[in-house]
A protein has these predicted regions:
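Short, threonine-centered small-residue motifs that mark membrane-proximal processing/anchoring sites
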Residues: 1-14, 18-25, 158-189, 195
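Mature extracellular "passenger" or substrate-interacting domains of secreted, surface-exposed proteins
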Residues: 23-168
Length: 195
């Protein structure tokens, strides 16, 4: 009987020891009381982000040698809107690392629809109709059918390097100002070309 317990303890220890931590989470930076809670298991970086404002939140990481063991590193987040304001869109921006193919998903809890979405090597974005007032999902933090985590590309990176993931829900006015600025630049360039 004693040997049986020792064998079970050894198997449990080996199981937990083989699950290397994905990357060291160095904390989050944000303004206005936004909170990040880490739920990382193995090589799957997973977070709950509780946003009380539209201020961006940046998650900071350091790679370890165990991160290059062959398991793909993935990212997911459940983003809760605690602000009472509708989130019209989301931008996820990477610094120091890139997304690997295939792209992951950005979905909602069903009270709003994803009206447009896209991604590049360092950014993923989505627009919501109507604005999300409850929560949305970057990747598959709850393991729901049809949702896919975002895979991070470790090619060319080394242990000790740092990277960050910034989640922002910008104000619609930000886009309006950007469009107005681009229109003004286009007008100035056209005028210069004509003159």
């Amino acid at each position: 009987m004693k040997l049986h317990h020792i064998a079970l303890a050894a198997i449990a220890a080996a199981t937990f020891a083989s699950q290397a931590q994905a990357a060291v989470f160095n904390g989050a930076t944000s303004a206005a009381g936004n909170v990040a809670t880490e739920f990382t298991i193995g090589s799957a970086l997973s977070f709950d982000l509780d946003l009380v404002s539209k201020a961006p939140i940046t998650l900071n990481f350091t790679l370890e040698s165990a991160d290059f063991s062959g398991d793909a590193m993935t990212f997911s987040a459940l983003v809760r809107n605690l602000s009472g304001l509708g989130f019209d869109n989301v931008n996820v921006t990477l610094s120091g690392i890139t997304f690997a193919a295939p792209a992951g998903t950005i979905t909602t809890d069903g009270f709003s629809a994803v009206s447009a979405y896209g991604s590049s090597a360092t950014q993923a974005w989505a627009s919501f109709t109507p604005g999300v007032s409850s929560e949305f999902y970057i990747g598959s933090p709850l393991g729901n059918a049809g949702e896919v985590n975002w895979t991070l590309n470790l090619d060319g990176l080394q242990a000790g390097q740092q990277f960050s993931v910034t989640v922002a829900v910008p104000e619609p006015e930000t886009y309006g100002l950007a469009v107005a600025g681009l229109a003004a630049l286009g007008f100035a360039a056209r005028r210069r070309k004509a003159g």
